[in-house]
From Swiss-Prot:
Disruption phenotype: Does not affect the annullatin D biosynthesis pathway.
Recorded superkingdom: Eukaryota
Protein name, entry field: FAD-dependent monooxygenase anuJ
Lineage, highest ranks first: Eukaryota, Fungi, Dikarya, Ascomycota, Pezizomycotina
GO molecular function: FAD binding; monooxygenase activity
Amino acid sequence: MLHSPPPFADGLRPLKVIIIGGGIAGLSLANAFEKAPVPIEYVILEARDTIAPQVGAGIALAPSGCRILDQLGVYDDLEQLVHPVQSSGVCDGQGKSLLPERSDTALLVTARMSYPLGWVERRSVLQVLFKHICHKKSVLTSKRMDRIEHSREQEKPIKVICTDGSFYEGDLVVGADGVHSKTRSEMWRVVEQNICDDFDVQQERRAMMAEYQCMFGISSPIPGLDAGMTDDTLARDVSMVVASGKDGKIFWFLFKRMPQVYHSHEIPRFDSADALKFAEQYFDFPVQSGASNIKFSDLWERRETATLVPLEEADFAHWTAGRIVCLGDSAHKMTPHTGTGGMLALEHAAVLANIICRLVAQGNKLPLTTSQIGTALSQYDEKRRHRRTSAKIKSTGASARMQTLQSLADRLVVRFLLPYAGDIRADQFCDDAIGAEHIEYMPVPARSMTGLMPFNPNRGIGMHESIWPRVLWALPLLGMAVAGLLTMFSVAPFEDAYDFLARRRYREVEIRDKFYHSGLLDDFSRSGVLRFIVSEAHFFYQPFSFFADYGVWYGIMLVESARRANRLNVLSFALLWGMLNMWGIAIFVPIYYFAYYILTPISTFDASDRRLTNLSYTKTILPVLLATHYATFMDAYLSPVRSHRQAAGFLWELFPVWLSLAQAGLARKFLQPSTLKQDRLNNVTRDLPTIRTTILGLCAVSTAVWQYTVWCSEDSLVNIFIPILSSAQGQTFEQLFAEFLKWDQVFFAIPNLFWIILLFADLRAAGLIHAGWLKISFSALGLIIAGGNGTMLGLMWLYREEVLATRRDRGAVVRPIA
């Protein structure tokens, strides 16, 4: 019988839905229908004789699905059955750990998304979902579908006929009957008979393939596998995932790559004899690294259930046709490596409920036509949703292949990058979850809006910003780098400089030949020493102001190098950027900005903890920068003893090296243990006071030098800072050297401003700020007038930092501000 909702005062005609399959997707959809604000009748036809059979499978509950379960009012019951994952380990086929220590990355997922990762029996999820259904008589077991009758007549209902001869009529059929979906086959038949829609059915039939087989099971507790632990074992062509749930119950999956890739009807099936033979091959396969010495044989001996299946993968291009719609594994199938499949089925059940609710709310009094239903269902079968689903299928497939070390790249990543990957697995889980769907006609749970990474339908897997528009926007920075290179080196008096260095004398000043007593280091540094000698004698103010501004940039670069979001990219290599700039600030600062803009779109900071920096290093920035950059720079210009000036010049030329060594020493000796691991979970703004002090301190120095230049120089600012655009012919060595440094500063200052424009454009696009470009421009101009280019750079960047720490993207689902 169909569940009939109570009559609605507005006389809306109820929509009749036949759900094939009483699994997680089908039961969730039924729960959503019962809570709809419009009349929706439904019946669930389940082929098995019980609604919650023991098939020996565990399911990972992840935030994307938990929010929907919370909306349905079932999550509290499920949470009692779950022990949240608290620690994770990864080892190789010999039992050697691939991580420096067990990871708490699952706790970070909880802190970000407000729902923990946890494992539970699939049967328990079904039992809880069924428990919350009010009209249980609408859930029928032992009802195996035989066929679907879909009429060409627009207003005729669709009919489902079961193998026992019973039949059911409704407005549409939802196929939630799994990977071997009879509904999907019937939908293809209807299309082939030209009853509705038109797409390439043969291509759809070829979409399914299987490259892996999986033995999954449940075992009773084993000492050493405590509740809340997960362990992965990675080896060539075989891998294993083991998770310990409530009361120590163990859920496990043993994956193996099959000899070939099978397609569609070629995909093999396995029986109990195959399962036993398969298991015996891997009795010695390690489960966990360390002294526990737990092997697969221990799981096998304590098994409660064990099943061997092929792992189908399919990305079907069409989920609907006429009055038929596929849901869950019947529409898309992926490997279980990331626990995505079940959660995606919940999401799509929510989407389908939203669409059907809107369809009924339109107030149709007459029976809905096939065209009307098809038009509504096209919102479900849309490009955006396919893109996100396809991305998840590819992601889980890539995970399966990496865990079995399928390619050379996979083996290199596991061997060399995985130990340093930090929270990359949390990033992957959260990227899967952040863009999750929800039930639109039910309140969003308050719990889901309190995490460090709010849900956002515009973010996440399948919704990532394309890199190419960012490349195009940032291309002018590369143009500036090239222009700086060509312009500076067109005026640089290299021959005269080499001559002075070779003679070890500039005019009447002797140039020190050795300082480090290393030919490589001394030769590298002497040219810079010449810069200080020449500029101090002939054009003091411009380089003095320039290198004060450069200190602000260097401080920002050091903060960015300590940022969690930049842990695995080139921005973390502060020493590299520092030494490159010694070959030309105007060349490599724009390149740094280009890399930064490409690598850190605004979505990088959707999780507040990714903005966080390692405070052990951030605390050292101001003192070590003052000691290694500013002190040596000031001494090289202002010391009354000429020999001290040259010594300071030698030291300054390698200040990035001394700075890096000082940072490492201070961080390890005086600022340990690092609080980063705790801060990322519960104190993500802990570094802000230190960052403020650092940048404001550097800006104060830059402003003081700028004001000193403005008020103490007898020359005009134009003559001090603006290079001559005419030919360099006929100019003296000193004049050419001055022009060289002026161009160096010009092609440092312009990229600074352009980078700030790009960063603020990101803030505006995300709705993080609402100021217009006129206000932003006048703010930047005012800062330049008051404190110079370096102060503008530092304070505008610091404002952005405050915004990133305290505001949310316009699409974020958060509690409204009272």
